[in-house]
From Swiss-Prot:
UniProt keyword list: Metal-binding, Zinc, Zinc-finger
Keyword Metal-binding: yes
Segments of skewed composition (Polar residues): 1-21, 90-109
GO aspect biological process, one term: regulation of DNA-templated transcription
Name this protein carries in UniProt: GATA zinc finger domain-containing protein 14
UniProt cross-references to SUPFAM superfamilies, sorted A to Z: Glucocorticoid receptor-like (DNA-binding domain)
One GO MF term: zinc ion binding
Low complexity bias spans: 22-89, 219-330, 342-683, 690-756
Segments forming GATA-type zinc fingers: 893-918
Cross-referenced Pfam families: GATA
Length: 953
């Protein structure tokens, strides 16, 4: 049934993209009481959408919600029913396999209620001002899903019937529809009602009819607005700025007015859309001139950038132009033949080509603007990089929603449902075209392939030299990476690749152009989560890295010259320098061959993931060193697989002659054999790293200066040595001098022998070690060591506990400060400790007087006192002074020295002089002594009865 349409002053029936299909967008955007105002608001809303989308280029996090709100409103309607309107080719669901269920599966639905509505349609000549009313009862209707007018974007749908306009009535022009806009709307408002009885007409889809999603062609402003939505959304898909959107508005208004005139203009709309895509690309170039350095710095690179990003697009646009020219002829003939099927197929073909073209335009132009906005916002490059890169998927989703503004489900399906095929197809197309266009970039930017290779050596080494030498080429590399990012969405390694390369490039641009305006401290590197918190000197280090790379690896050569005095270190740095150059070239080949070879893509992904895991855009030189085995495989550099808790896993094999791992217990040397130089048996590496690490404070400091490749202060000086060998202009002299000083003796030759190693190796039990453990005590003739008596073990345990508690209090006082109570407590514990030590020494002096026979007479106590007993909780009312006992009054056992016993016993020293166990043992001995004395008194005179007392004492 027809539902009563609300006031058309707020919803234009002439808006081909509004009404039942785009009513959420209209409810969100149009709230005025005049049709012209509503159309103007449509234009304003489209311009606002363009502004939001252009703001998405700058602040994706801030305006993604706006785009998602506006686009989700259109998304519900676009997924409900594509509107195959002639004035909106981009708003059609043009996938041939995804036709509307209402159009295909249920062609014979019957409209329950029909009203007699006079719809004004002009006659054959497009310039004739006359128009005759056609009753709507003569127009067949079809029941389709529609969404009622509501301000919410709910997906509840009811069924209603819509008129189907015969193609015999020629589509009016925009100038003719202006005067008839209000008449149409008023007639529709007066005739459409819920309660009006209507006749039932059987509807069927003949080849003489075309289904029009909205009722009639209304005012000239609203189709222009719809096409402005299309073209603006095309510009939004291309992420153009406001200038490009305005250009598209101006060009598309002309095209839209011609679109209404004739079916040829409909097909010209495709051509115009393609031209608008080209204009969008040109406007993107203008925007690139404002957002980046492409047009400003290098016009040739700008043209080559268009060739890079839009070579597929231009080829596709040419193909689409030729296809559209065929469509112009064929489509016009099909309209004369009045074939709906052919028209849909024609539209599907056009829109498939258009959507493929838009996919290419979207990917490439969006990458252009994405990177160029990064280059534009170099003052806030971390924020924009984080927003843009963290929201790569969000931007793609926003682009899908922007395409939903176009109601182009085919384009969305090309991005989502056909991601396996379409994205791979784009990937293969980008394989061919990006490589060719990248070579065009090389010739256009550098005009020299050798120069291009040099720029690659600078670019991928730290991407800074590439930015300074040719910012346009840097943007082209970003476009390649972002093409991988958008086209290869199912490869997260490529996306990490783009994280690294984009942030490296823009971050290095930021350093080169602005010298760290807001990148000091923790905000220095957006991905360097490990080095930021510990490295306040990251700024100097990475700035010097950029200077090194801007000097075409002169710093690495300087390292080679500084370490030239040491032969072994010379070979090491030579390997590093060679590996850096090879990695630079290989990474540029990975830029050239990211889309040519999947194996190279995997290697590039491994390298870039290692860049994320190892250095996170701080030490690209050193990451190239660590990742050299992934690219070259046999350069002899070790990435030293870390097994520490804080280090990130690296999968490169350890075939290095140098392994700077000091603690092989925590840092395994990978897959090296015991005989290989990287094995734990090769203590050359351990010794020199111990010297470089512990004796060389510059190495430790420089390791903290932004060059901790996950060292984590655990003694792994692999990357510290690499960094110190190739680090900074400020630190090269110190590090290289220290390396030379420390390594002239240790690394004088690569074939040092084992006795030379042992001379400098820190012994475990030696004097140079941090912990000295005596193996066997030095025995003198005058002194002999006695074992600890069982009765004295408790005393030694308590001495240990007291000393530990004193040390803990001292440590806490260093960090948290000390109070008078803590000082008094430490003093009291110290006096207790001294008293206990004195008692033990007295007992040891007594025990040394006894021989073995006398010692055997003293048995250990049968029961052992518990060390820790539960004590009663002190009363809260007691003053704190009574809690602390005077240490002079503390009792201790004169036999074993313990201070904790359940009961004190009488001993030879008086009452409460023995603990419970010793007192009981003493009592048994006294009983035995008394019994023996009684026996002896009967036979012999009494002897001394103080044997037990002497033994106990």
């Amino acid at each position: 049934m027809f539902e009563k349409i609300p006031n058309q002053n707020s919803h234009s029936m002439g808006d081909n993209n509004t009404g039942y299909y785009n009513n959420n967008n209209n409810n969100n955007n149009n709230n005025n009481n005049n049709n012209n105002n509503s159309n103007n608001n449509n234009n304003n809303s489209n311009n606002n959408n363009n502004n939001n989308i252009n703001n998405n280029n700058n602040n994706n996090n801030n305006n993604n919600n706006n785009n998602n709100n506006n686009n989700n409103n259109n998304n519900n309607t676009s997924q409900q029913l594509p509107s195959p309107q002639l004035s909106q080719p981009n708003s059609m669901n043009t996938t041939p396999n995804q036709t509307s269920p209402n159009l295909r599966s249920s062609p014979n639905r019957v409209a329950n209620n029909m009203t007699q509505i006079n719809i004004l349609t002009p006659h054959l000549l497009p310039g004739s001002p006359s128009a005759s009313p056609i009753p709507i009862s003569s127009i067949p209707t079809a029941s389709v899903y529609r969404q009622p007018f509501s301000s919410s974007s709910s997906s509840n749908h009811d069924q209603g019937s819509y008129p189907i306009i015969n193609t015999k009535s020629i589509i009016p022009s925009a100038s003719q529809l202006q005067s008839q806009n209000l008449n149409i709307i008023n007639s529709i408002n007066n005739n459409f009602s819920k309660d009006s009885p209507n006749s039932q007409n059987n509807t069927s889809f003949n080849e003489d009819t075309i289904f029009i999603a909205s009722t009639t062609y209304g005012s000239s402003n609203t189709p222009n607005n719809n096409n402005n939505n299309i073209n603006n959304n095309n510009s939004n898909n291309n992420n153009n700025s406001n200038n490009s959107n305005n250009n598209n508005n101006s060009t598309n208004n002309n095209n839209n007015s011609s679109n209404i005139n004739s079916p040829n203009d409909f097909n010209n709309n495709h051509n115009n859309n393609n031209n608008n895509n080209n204009n969008n690309n040109n406007n993107n170039n203008n925007n690139n001139s404002s957002n980046s350095n492409i047009n400003n710095n290098n016009n040739n690179s700008n043209n080559s950038n268009n060739n890079i990003d839009n070579s597929n697009n231009n080829n596709n646009n040419n193909n689409v132009r030729s296809g559209n020219s065929n469509v112009n002829a064929n489509g016009h003939n099909r309209l004369k033949r009045k074939s709906k099927e052919n028209i849909y197929n024609n539209n599907n073909q056009n829109n498939n080509n258009q959507n493929n073209n838009q996919n290419n335009n979207h990917n490439n132009n969006h990458n252009n603007n994405h990177n160029n906005n990064q280059n534009n916002n170099q003052n806030n490059i971390q924020n924009t990089n984080q927003n843009n890169i963290q929201n790569n998927h969000n931007q793609q989703n926003n682009n899908n929603h922007q395409n939903n503004n176009n109601q182009n489900n085919n384009y969305q399906n090309n991005n989502n449902q056909n991601s396996g095929n379409n994205n791979n197809q784009n990937h293969h197309n980008n394989k061919f075209n990006q490589n060719n266009n990248h070579n065009q970039n090389n010739h256009s930017n550098n005009q020299n392939k050798n120069n291009h290779n040099n720029n690659h050596n600078n670019n991928n080494h730290n991407n800074n030299n590439h930015n300074n030498n040719n910012n346009n080429h840097n943007n082209n590399n970003n476009n390649h990476n972002n093409n991988n990012n958008h086209n290869n969405q199912n490869n997260h390694n490529n996306q990490n690749n783009n994280h690294n390369n984009n942030q490296n490039n823009n971050y290095n641009n930021n350093q080169n152009n602005n010298y760290n305006p807001n990148n000091y401290g923790n905000n220095y590197n957006p991905n360097n989560n490990y080095n930021n918190s510990n490295n306040p000197n990251n700024m100097n280090n990475n700035y010097n890295h950029n200077q090194n790379n801007n000097n075409n690896n002169n710093n690495n050569n300087q390292n080679y010259n500084n370490n030239h005095n040491n032969q072994f270190n010379n070979q090491n740095n030579q390997i590093h320098n060679q590996s850096n150059n090879q990695n630079n070239y290989n990474q540029n080949n990975n830029h050239n061959n990211n889309n040519q070879n999947n194996n190279n893509n995997n290697q590039n992904n491994n390298n870039n993931n290692n860049q994320n895991n190892n250095n996170n855009n701080n030490n690209i030189n050193n990451n190239n060193n660590n990742n050299n085995n992934n690219n070259n495989g046999n350069t002899g550099l070790s990435s030293s697989t870390n097994n520490s808790k804080h280090s990130s896993p690296r999968s490169s094999p350890n075939n290095s002659p140098l392994n700077y791992n000091t603690n092989e217990e925590y840092y395994n040397s990978g897959s090296s054999s015991p005989s290989s130089p990287g094995s734990p048996n090769s203590s050359i590496l351990q010794i020199t790293d111990g010297n470089n690490g512990f004796n060389n404070q510059n190495n430790l400091n420089n390791g903290n200066n932004g060059n901790q490749n996950y060292n984590n202060n655990n003694g792994q000086f692999n990357n510290n040595f690499d960094n110190n060998g190739q680090n900074n202009n400020n630190n090269n002299n110190n590090n290289n001098n220290n390396n030379n000083n420390n390594n002239e003796n240790n690394r004088n030759s690569p074939t040092t022998t084992q006795p030379q190693i042992q001379t400098t190796q820190p012994l475990i039990n030696g004097a140079n070690s941090a912990f000295v453990f005596p193996s066997t005590p030095k025995t003198n003739s005058s002194t002999t060591l006695f074992g600890v008596m069982p009765n004295e073990q408790e005393t030694w345990i308590e001495i240990r506990d007291l000393s530990c508690s004193i040390s803990k209090m001292a440590k806490s006082s260093l960090t948290n400060g000390i109070t008078e109570e803590m000082l008094n407590e430490i003093k009291e514990k110290g006096t207790d400790l001294i008293n206990m030590i004195e008692n033990v020494t007295q007992k040891e002096k007594l025990e040394r007087k006894y021989n073995d026979d006398d010692r055997n007479r003293i048995f250990p106590p049968l029961t052992r006192p518990r060390r820790f007993r539960k004590k009663k909780k002190p009363n809260v009312t007691e003053p704190p002074v009574e809690k602390v006992k005077k240490k002079a009054d503390t009792l201790f056992c004169t036999s074993c020295g313990t201070t904790q016993t359940p009961e004190w016993r009488k001993g030879p020293a008086g009452g409460k002089s023995l603990c419970n166990a010793c007192g009981l043992h003493y009592a048994k001995l006294m009983k035995k002594e008394i019994q023996l004395s009684k026996v002896e008194t009967t036979s012999s005179p009494p002897s001394t009865s103080m044997n037990v007392v002497n033994l106990l004492n």
